[in-house]
A protein has these predicted regions:
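Amphipathic, membrane-active segments
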Residues: 4-65
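Long, helix-rich, hydrophobic modules that act as membrane-proximal anchors or helical bundle/coiled-coil regulators
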Residues: 40-43, 47-218
Length: 218
């Protein structure tokens, strides 16, 4: 029946249109998450230039709060993506062959997860540098302890976890695997009794080059 085929074709077109719209929303959401972290970093650079001590202190507190908000949003998103990637990795080769769209979705989640790791690290660094500017090192230690908990909860201290992300991503990022392996080792070995004011920069390093939020599906 031609009319039935026409209706079915229209429905399939509409489903594909909705799928494209959802992917566009996803890209916008990921860009918003990354922009939060970038905004906190920009605020830190600007706050350092404020001459008035009281205004600088108020601005620095705003920097810290912005960095914490960005960090938490990215951490939650990373954990959700990591859950789906782990579930996907347990499928058989045959199941994966039958689920092409799922494979593409997992690749997007892996790309997002790598981006999130870099920006989470940068957000923690922003938090710590903000507290250091205020001469408050105890909350800085707390930030590092929270980061350590995140790393351990997501098994990011295990290189295999990072390699799983890389394996499922269409954009191979072995350099991020190497960098974060090093960061995770230092953070998990961090001694909270250490002189934190001398070690923040050594503990936290991550590059943002080539980790832009734009999707490869645009």
């Amino acid at each position: 029946n031609l009319s039935t085929h026409a209706v079915m074709a229209q429905i399939l077109d509409e489903i594909e249109y909705v799928g494209d719209a959802i992917r566009e929303i996803h890209v916008e959401l990921q860009n918003d998450r990354l922009a939060m972290a970038e905004g906190a970093r920009d605020k830190l650079i600007q706050a350092r230039l404020i001459q008035d001590a009281k205004l600088r202190e108020a601005a620095m507190l705003d920097v810290i709060h912005s960095a914490t908000d960005a960090k938490r949003v990215l951490m939650r998103n990373f954990s959700q993506n990591m859950y789906h990637i782990t579930e996907h990795s347990q499928k058989s080769d045959f199941q994966m062959m039958l689920d092409f769209k799922g494979e593409k979705d997992i690749s997007r989640k892996a790309i997002d997860a790598f981006q999130a790791l870099v920006y989470i690290t940068n957000s923690v660094q922003t938090e710590c540098e903000g507290y250091a500017m205020l001469g408050e090192y105890e909350p800085c230690k707390e930030c590092l302890e929270e980061f350590k908990s995140f790393i351990l909860e997501n098994r990011l201290n295990e290189r295999d976890t990072l390699l799983l992300l890389n394996e499922n991503s269409s954009q191979k990022r072995i350099e991020v695997v190497d960098q974060f392996t090093d960061i995770a080792a230092r953070i998990t070995a961090f001694d909270p009794k250490a002189h934190i004011e001398y070690s923040v920069h050594n503990l936290l390093t991550a590059e943002t080059e080539h980790t832009g939020g734009d999707s490869d599906e645009q």
